[in-house]
């Protein structure tokens, strides 16, 4: 039986969640309806589950969700991570820090020695924040929740389901199978077999 580790982006990214419904209630009920019939096991780390409940509120969660989606943290102390992944991560962080410094220097020059830039100061600060955030966070693991999701998929030899490009990138480095979250509904349908047949639901 196939195993899937779910990232919060399935339910929080509107471009992804709309495959299951038009609002939060129909999204969760639509997912659970298919997942409960699929011949598969579903997992989500506790940290990611807490984050999801914080974002969406507790109203959409019930015993049904926790019955279908196993809430379980990775066994961090037992996992052996390839050293090459750690070296790649350090190199990536170093490059991003250098890039962030260049962005900061660029905006300092725009401000000028006397703050005489034609760009209003608050706009300049906002632009600096946005570019700095993009340089340091986009396409990288930037939270404990992201790391927990990847480590759990690695430990269980499961399929990682996410829309996050940074998670996809680092999961690929670790040899984790990846499913684009936008394809999850179709995948679940293929894993549902009608009673008495061996064929998936069309």
UniProtKB/Swiss-Prot annotation:
GO terms for molecular function: ribonuclease P activity. SUPFAM superfamilies: PIN domain-like. GO terms for biological process: tRNA 5'-leader removal. It catalyses: Endonucleolytic cleavage of RNA, removing 5'-extranucleotides from tRNA precursor. Disulfide bonds: none annotated. Signal peptide: none annotated. Gene3D superfamilies: 5'-nuclease. It comes from the Bacteria. Pfam families: PIN_5. The keyword Transcription regulation does not apply. RNA-free RNase P that catalyzes the removal of the 5'-leader sequence from pre-tRNA to produce the mature 5'-terminus. Belongs to the HARP family. This is RNA-free ribonuclease P.
């Amino acid at each position: 039986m196939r195993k899937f580790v779910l990232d919060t982006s399935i339910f929080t990214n509107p471009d992804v969640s709309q495959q299951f419904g038009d609002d939060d209630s129909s999204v969760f009920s639509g997912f659970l309806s298919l997942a409960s019939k699929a011949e598969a096991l579903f997992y989500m780390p506790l940290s990611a589950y807490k984050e999801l409940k914080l974002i969406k509120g507790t109203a959409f969660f019930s015993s049904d969700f926790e019955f279908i989606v196993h809430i379980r943290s990775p066994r961090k102390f037992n996992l052996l991570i390839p050293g090459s992944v750690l070296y790649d991560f350090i190199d990536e962080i170093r490059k991003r820090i250098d890039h962030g410094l260049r962005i900061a220097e660029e905006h300092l020059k725009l401000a000028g020695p006397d703050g005489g830039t034609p760009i209003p100061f608050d706009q300049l600060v906002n632009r600096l924040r946005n570019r700095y955030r993009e340089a340091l966070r986009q396409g990288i693991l930037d939270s404990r929740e992201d790391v927990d999701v990847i480590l759990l998929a690695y430990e269980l030899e499961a399929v990682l389901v996410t829309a996050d490009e940074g998670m996809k990138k680092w999961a690929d480095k670790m040899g984790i199978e990846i499913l684009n979250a936008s394809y999850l509904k179709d995948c679940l349908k293929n894993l549902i077999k009608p009673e008495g047949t061996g064929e998936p639901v069309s």
